[in-house]
């Protein structure tokens, strides 16, 4: 019984749309009737003028009475149209609010469904895992970018030898002779002269004298060689 008066749930959902359609159609019908009444008013006005021109005042009054009736109907009709327009605007606005609320409710339901399996602890755990993976990726990248042979493992002596070899090759290519080291000037040393003293011993024979002469010659020769080396 209540369904007969209020309709089913589906009918109630379609009621705003049906009301909007019916109101628009009825307003269009009233607008057409309004245009027809305006035409009748204009005709009665013209007929009244013609009756006056012909001198028939009674007919002119009759046309004017009809004109007044049409004008009264036109005013009532305009009031109805204004009321229907206001009602149509209210229903459309209410229906728009309803549809907006439905859309928001569906959005809230979708968000609730999405967040059903989520909580702050799970989100924090996931973010921690992401940070760990990012740090691990950075460490892996740094490890891959390092050279396979470390600088500390290189033999410094081998590097020095290779460096000398390269310098020698460059000198040969550029035809540049190595600069000789500056000869160091040795300071001059004044040595005391060896005294030329001959011991006159009666027991000294000629053989001993010859031996002393040879030793003296060797000493003088050694002294000359030393002076030559020292640049004296």
UniProtKB/Swiss-Prot annotation:
Q: Which UniProt keywords apply?
A: Cytoplasm, Endosome, Membrane
Spans of biased composition, class Acidic residues?
Answer: 209-220
- Set out the biological process GO terms recorded for this chain's protein: late endosome to vacuole transport via multivesicular body sorting pathway; vesicle budding from membrane
Q: Give the matching Gene3D superfamilies.
A: 6.10.250.1710, ESAT-6-like
GO annotation, cellular component aspect: cytoplasmic side of plasma membrane; ESCRT III complex; multivesicular body
Map out region (Disordered) in residue numbers: 178-232
Q: What domain of life? A: Eukaryota
| Regions of compositional bias (Basic and acidic residues) in chain numbering | 221-232
**Localized where?**
Cytoplasm; Endosome membrane
Q: Where is the composition biased (Low complexity)?
A: 178-187
Membrane topology designation: Peripheral membrane protein
Q: Which family does it belong to?
A: Belongs to the SNF7 family.
Subunit structure comment from the entry: A component of the endosomal sorting required for transport complex III (ESCRT-III).
Name the PANTHER family on file.
CHARGED MULTIVESICULAR BODY PROTEIN, GH13992P
- Give the function comment from the record: Required for the sorting and concentration of proteins resulting in the entry of these proteins into the invaginating vesicles of the multivesicular body (MVB). Also required for the proteolytic cleavage of the transcription factor RIM101 in response to alkaline ambient pH.
Q: What is this protein called?
A: Vacuolar-sorting protein SNF7
Instruction: Name its species.
Output: Kluyveromyces lactis (strain ATCC 8585 / CBS 2359 / DSM 70799 / NBRC 1267 / NRRL Y-1140 / WM37) (Yeast)
Corresponding gene?
SNF7
């Amino acid at each position: 019984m209540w369904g007969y008066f209020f309709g089913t749930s589906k009918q109630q959902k379609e009621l705003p749309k049906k009301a909007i359609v019916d109101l628009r159609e009825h307003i269009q019908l009233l607008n057409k009737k309004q245009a027809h009444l305006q035409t009748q008013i204009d005709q009665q006005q013209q007929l009244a003028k013609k009756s006056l021109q012909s001198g028939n005042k009674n007919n002119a009054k009759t046309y004017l009475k009809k004109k007044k009736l049409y004008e009264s109907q036109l005013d009532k009709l305009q009031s109805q149209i204004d009321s229907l327009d206001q009602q149509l605007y209210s229903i459309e606005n209410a229906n728009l609010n309803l549809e907006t609320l439905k859309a928001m409710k569906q959005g809230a339901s979708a968000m609730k469904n999405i967040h059903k399996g989520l909580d702050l602890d799970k989100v924090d755990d996931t973010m921690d895992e992401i940070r760990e993976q990012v740090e691990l990726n950075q460490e892996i990248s740094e490890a891959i970018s390092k050279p396979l042979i470390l600088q500390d493992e290189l033999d410094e002596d081998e590097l020095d030898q290779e460096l000398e070899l390269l310098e020698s090759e460059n000198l040969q290519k550029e035809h540049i002779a190595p600069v000789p080291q500056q000869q160091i000037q040795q300071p001059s040393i004044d040595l005391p002269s060896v005294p030329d003293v001959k011991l006159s011993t009666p027991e000294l024979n000629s053989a001993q004298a010859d031996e002393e002469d040879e030793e003296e010659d060797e000493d003088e020769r050694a002294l000359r060689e030393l002076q030559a080396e020292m640049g004296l």
